[in-house]
Amino acid sequence: MAASAHAPTASEYIVHHLQHLQNVPQTKIVDFSVVNYDSMVLALLLGGLTLLILWTAARKASCGVPGRLQAAVEILVEMVDNQAKANIHNAESRKFIAPLGLVVFVWVFLMNAMDMVPVDLLPSIWGQIRQDSHEPLRVVPTADLSTTMGLALAVLGLRFWYSLKIKGAGGWAHELVSAPFGTSKNPLFALILGLVNLLMQVIEYVANTVSHGMRLFGNMYAGELVFMLIALMGGAAALSLSGVLLPVGHVIAGTLWTLFHILVITLQAFIFMMLALIYLGQAHNAH
């Protein structure tokens, strides 16, 4: 055996589990040439699973006593439909936005739920397949900022589309330079107010989009780190001869955090969907 072989330290373990399976190493904070294959593939697979679940529920829907899947989907449909009606008053737009909200909620929930998979399970399987235990793999797509910001940018694109569709190019352009401070009959003041209003609108769009993606990413990233620390506690317990405190602490901490995290992943999926509906509702309303 090689003399250099050794068990990873706690910091090495965490750093390894925070690395993505990428096409090229990332050297800059923002680098659009880098593709996180793990996040992309898992997000697409879970997106397909989302569509399969909803399609299956729709295909098996009946007027009689609903099954568990149909009952669960009906509850979600009613919840999303009520929120869509509260935020988007255009019935024609709701025909697309309400189903989209349902897909977003289920999709984000499934991506968040990957955090419930044991930390080392899928990376270990991937390492066995690749015959390299150091091969990185992250399994929570929403703990990747690229995923959450991509979703937030998609919502931003829809905001722009509905602003143009509902208000027209002229109406939206007028809104961009007249809200929130209004305008003036004086040409000079009107120009100054128009520039200030446009700047405020740009700041609002940027702030909404960044916070939309960062909120989901931050919560899921933190949850992932906590699970890693609990896993380290379990590893320390396995190697410790000092008593039962570490094993008991590992079990208690893991159980409590898992139960709490079920609430977190559900709440974060709901918040992300709600913000999407609110932002799309704003695109329909005059400022």
From Swiss-Prot:
Similarity-based family: Belongs to the ATPase A chain family.
Protein task: Key component of the proton channel; it plays a direct role in the translocation of protons across the membrane.
Organism placement in taxonomy: Bacteria, Pseudomonadati, Pseudomonadota, Betaproteobacteria, Burkholderiales
Quaternary state and interactors: F-type ATPases have 2 components, CF(1) - the catalytic core - and CF(0) - the membrane proton channel. CF(1) has five subunits: alpha(3), beta(3), gamma(1), delta(1), epsilon(1). CF(0) has three main subunits: a(1), b(2) and c(9-12). The alpha and beta chains form an alternating ring which encloses part of the gamma chain. CF(1) is attached to CF(0) by a central stalk formed by the gamma and epsilon chains, while a peripheral stalk is formed by the delta and b chains.
A single GO cellular-component term on record: plasma membrane
SUPFAM superfamilies: F1F0 ATP synthase subunit A
TM annotation in the entry: 38-58, 96-116, 139-161, 187-207, 225-245, 259-279
Record-given protein name: ATP synthase subunit a
Molecular function GO labels: proton-transporting ATP synthase activity, rotational mechanism
Gene3D superfamilies, alphabetized: ATP synthase, F0 complex, subunit A
